[in-house]
Structures are given as C-alpha cells and as structure tokens.
C-alpha cells in the first residue's frame, strides 16, 4: 500500500524523481491565474472597496458637518431665545415703569383737581361770607340809623349816616 501511495504522490507509476515540467506548467498557470484574478477580479473588487471606503468616509464627514451645523443652530436658537426673553423682561419692566408713571400722574392730576375744587369752594365760602357780612353790616347800619333817628327824633343825612355806620362797624370789628 505504501508503494501505491508513493506512486500517486510522485505523479505517475514508473517515474522517479521530480517532474520539473509539470511544476513549471503548474506554476506558470498559477501565476497567469493570479494575474487574471488581479486584473479582472481583484482590481474591480479593490476599486469597489475603495469607492465604498470613500463613500463611508464622505458620509462620516457629512454626518460630522451636520452635527456641527446642528450644534451651531442650537446655540443660535439658545441665543435667540435668551435675547427674546431679555427683550420681554425689558418690555415688562418698561411697562411697569410706565404704569407707575401713569398712576402717579393720575394721582397728581386728581390732587390738583381736588385742591382746585377745595380752593374754589373756599373762595365761594369766602365770597358768601363777605356777602353775608356785608348784608349784616347793611342791616346793622340800617338798624343803627333807625335806632339813632328814633333816639334823636330826627332824620340824619346820608353822609352822617355813613360816618356813623363806619364808626359802629369799626367798633364791632375791634371787639
């Protein structure tokens, strides 16, 4: 059995040694096959793999750029939101200040009107008081003249009457 195995291993029955022709043909065939594989299979396969690698790298770069853009947009949105909130706060503060000013103006105008009404009322009261005093003075003078004329039993002149009235008014005012 070992002889049969040796025969198959060595290549053919009855030959001895290495068959260089077969080895060279096999080697040349193998090299041709490698060259054909490189040209028709390995080259296009490598091109496809290189293109795929390029596409993947491009997609990764695009994704990173999109991420950066998204971060920038998020920062811009945060900044815009902050500016908007600041502006709203400023408007609210201005509104409060304006409301306080209007409140103070309304109170001031109301005080001015009230003071004007009080002054008008006081002026009217003083006018009425002066009229009442003048009426009382006229009545007193008429009564004084009447009493004096009855006491003296004579009529006095208008000039004398005025002098007497002024004298009595002065005396009444001093008391």
UniProtKB/Swiss-Prot annotation:
It is a single-pass membrane protein. One of its GO terms (cellular component) is plasma membrane. Keywords: ATP synthesis, Cell membrane, CF(0), Hydrogen ion transport, Ion transport, Membrane, Transmembrane, Transmembrane helix, Transport. InterPro entries: ATP_synth_B-like_membr_sf (IPR028987), ATP_synth_b/b'su_bac/chlpt (IPR002146), ATP_synth_F0_bsu_bac (IPR005864), ATP_synthase_B_chain (IPR050059). It is found in: Cell membrane. GO terms for molecular function: proton-transporting ATP synthase activity, rotational mechanism; proton-transporting ATPase activity, rotational mechanism. It holds the Pfam family ATP-synt_B. It comes from the Bacteria. The chain crosses the membrane at residues 17-37. F-type ATPases have 2 components, F(1) - the catalytic core - and F(0) - the membrane proton channel. F(1) has five subunits: alpha(3), beta(3), gamma(1), delta(1), epsilon(1). F(0) has three main subunits: a(1), b(2) and c(10-14). The alpha and beta chains form an alternating ring which encloses part of the gamma chain. F(1) is attached to F(0) by a central stalk formed by the gamma and epsilon chains, while a peripheral stalk is formed by the delta and b chains. F(1)F(0) ATP synthase produces ATP from ADP in the presence of a proton or sodium gradient. F-type ATPases consist of two structural domains, F(1) containing the extramembraneous catalytic core and F(0) containing the membrane proton channel, linked together by a central stalk and a peripheral stalk. During catalysis, ATP synthesis in the catalytic domain of F(1) is coupled via a rotary mechanism of the central stalk subunits to proton translocation. Belongs to the ATPase B chain family. NCBIfam families: ATP_synt_b, PRK13453.1. This is ATP synthase subunit b. It comes from Staphylococcus saprophyticus subsp. saprophyticus (strain ATCC 15305 / DSM 20229 / NCIMB 8711 / NCTC 7292 / S-41). The lineage of its organism: Bacteria, Bacillati, Bacillota, Bacilli, Bacillales.
């Amino acid at each position: 059995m070992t002889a049969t195995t040796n025969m198959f291993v060595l290549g053919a029955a009855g030959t001895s040694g290495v068959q260089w022709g077969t080895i060279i043909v096999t080697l040349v065939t193998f090299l041709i096959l490698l060259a054909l594989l490189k040209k028709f299979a390995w080259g296009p396969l490598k091109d496809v793999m290189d293109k795929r690698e390029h596409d993947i790298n491009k997609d990764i770069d695009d994704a990173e750029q999109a991420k950066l853009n998204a971060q920038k947009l998020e920062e811009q949105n945060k900044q815009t939101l902050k500016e908007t909130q600041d502006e709203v706060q400023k408007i609210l503060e201005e509104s409060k200040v304006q409301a306080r000013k209007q409140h103070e103006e309304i109170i001031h105008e109301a005080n001015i009107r009230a003071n004007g009404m009080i002054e008008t009322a006081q002026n009217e009261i003083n006018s009425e008081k002066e009229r009442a005093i003048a009426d009382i003075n006229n009545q007193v003078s008429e009564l004084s003249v009447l009493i004096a004329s009855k006491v003296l039993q004579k009529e006095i002149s208008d000039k004398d009457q005025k002098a007497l009235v002024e004298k009595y008014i002065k005396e009444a005012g001093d008391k």
